Amino acid sequence: MILEIGGKILDALRLYIGTGHVSGLVEADETFFRLSYKGNHSKSKGFTMTRKPYLRGPKSKKSENEEPKPRGISRNQVAVMCAIDRTGNIISELICNGRMKYKDVERLFKGRIEENSTLCIDSHKSYIRLDNNFDVDIQKIETGKFKKGIYHIQHINSYHSRLKKWMDNFNGVATKYLANYMYWFKWIELFKTDKDAMKCKRLFIQSHASYSNTRIKDFKNRKPLYI
């Protein structure tokens, strides 16, 4: 019951905050979380795992049926794309499983990045057509480099570092709830300079500003929320 109440609050916050919009000098990069079916298969009659389970504990005690952990980026990882501009606007969305493609990046930024903005990115090939299709100036930071003149992606890397550290507190989040956690952290970042009393006031008002009609059974049957 506590999970469902918390989920309704986060649903309402997500609806209130929205995906967002960035402009000016923008940094963007993706980060990854392991695909998790936590909460789906326990006592479930209709759920089937799409892979073998990951088991914990000493290697000698692990089952032969355990799925080997893949190296690099695989379909068992969820890509979360984040973008931040210099005025503090944030976009943080689940975009795909595994390696992202141009169509995923295009879907995220369509209608959400101002024309004539400068987008600082890494050398991933998925960004290659953004400058022509979105009328933005692309500044690529090559692998192994920290900056390119005045351009860098240190703010977005720092955001990802804080996000991962914060997510460690939850010991694994089911992928079907991951979008809400991205918005929860986004909310924390947007109002991190507020005093605690103001944060409580904002949380109360904003969580009631948008109506969420999600029922308990909807949480159990929820699908991951990709942009």
Regions found by a protein language model. Give the residues of each.
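Residue-level recognition of single "structural anchor" positions
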Residues: M1-I227
